[in-house]
Amino acid sequence: MSNDKDSMNMSDLSTALNEEDRAGLVNALKNKLQNLAGQHSDVLENLTPPVRKRVEFLREIQNQYDEMEAKFFEERAALEAKYQKLYQPLYTKRYEIVNGVVEVEGAAEEVKSEQGEDKSAEEKGVPDFWLIALKNNEITAEEITERDEGALKYLKDIKWSRVEEPKGFKLEFFFDQNPYFKNTVLTKTYHMIDEDEPILEKALGTEIEWYPGKCLTQKILKKKPKKGSKNTKPITKTEDCESFFNFFSPPQVPDDDEDLDDDMADELQGQMEHDYDIGSTIKEKIISHAVSWFTGEAVEADDLDIEDDDDEIDEDDDEEDEEDDEDDEEEDDEDDDEEEEADQGKKSKKKSSAGHKKAGRSQLAEGQAGERPPECKQQ
């Protein structure tokens, strides 16, 4: 229980502090670890010498494991970097086909035979490829509104790359020229305190240069002036609204974290975790398996995983139901036994003679005491 509490405090600390100097944040974490180490040393002192000796030996084993794990993380990072380079030619081919830069052999001829030459000249690549892929994923679909779809039709590619100092990763969204904003590339960068055990330090996004009247993250409300008002023009008010493009304006912790109360800090932490979920989903799922999300195959695979989890839960419930049924049967058997014993007691009363009433009564009393139901005996 205490370990869970300690890990929760560490997570709160990492998301609540937002020092301009990253070293200051790391020092704060070190101080927290030192305090925890002091608490753990108190635990060791309270142990008996033999148990303390065993625990110290277990800690040595843990240190050996930690060294191996650190080496694993190092080798894994190198392996991922190696394969990330090998993936690039495949990503390039995908980009060229999706955007009609190159044509798949035989595709143009099939279109000509089915729809005519004029149609084949208009339709190139795979229209709305990234929009459909994003809409088919449950996490990213929740962020996309109908107003966003027009702009996301111009999305040509999504890439991700590692960031070394500080550790993290960057997402790049490449857009064709469009009537919504001037930017051709929108980026989102996640800076991590610990890349292997993801603790988010901060996230940064591109400032979108919206064309006049095209901002998708805000909506303009027009209200009629009150009757009798000198101003006859409608009152306009700008209000923030839901949009996928809010993703590029991530939640930020104020410079002075003392301004945050507990409720505000919890809400902000939830927003940052949700923002990271979106980014990691795009990085780990959408980019690497884009065509599967476009076709819906990835959705089916996700559904199968969910169904497997549900089946496990159902099996557990069935086992519990079976145990409950067995318990009910045992209770019914006990009740039947008690009724039989009671009937036998009544019969013995009738058969006993008047001369033996006292003896019968004493025996009956003893019988009643000795034949109490199991639950009474336990009391």
Curated annotation (Swiss-Prot):
Residues bearing the modification Phosphoserine: S41
Primary location group: nucleus
Alphabetized Pfam families for the sequence: NAP
UniProt GO cellular component terms: cytoplasm; cytosol; mitochondrion; nucleus
Induction data: By brassinosteroids.
GO BP term, pick one: DNA repair
Tissue: Ubiquitous.
Propeptide: 377-379
Stretches for region Disordered: 298-379
Tagged with keyword Ribosomal protein: no
Annotated compartments: Nucleus; Cytoplasm
Keywords: Chaperone, Coiled coil, Cytoplasm, Lipoprotein, Methylation, Nucleus, Phosphoprotein, Prenylation
Additional record remark: Triple mutant nap1;1-nap1;2-nap1;3 has no obvious visible phenotype but exhibits hypersensitivity to DNA damage after UV-radiation, affected transcription of NER related genes, slight hypersensitive response to abscisic acid (ABA) in seedling growth and impaired somatic homologous recombination.
Job of this protein: May modulate chromatin structure by regulation of nucleosome assembly/disassembly. May function in nucleotide excision repair (NER). Involved in somatic homologous recombination.
Name by which UniProt lists this protein: Nucleosome assembly protein 1;2
Originating species: Arabidopsis thaliana (Mouse-ear cress)
Lineage of the organism: Eukaryota, Viridiplantae, Streptophyta, Embryophyta, Tracheophyta
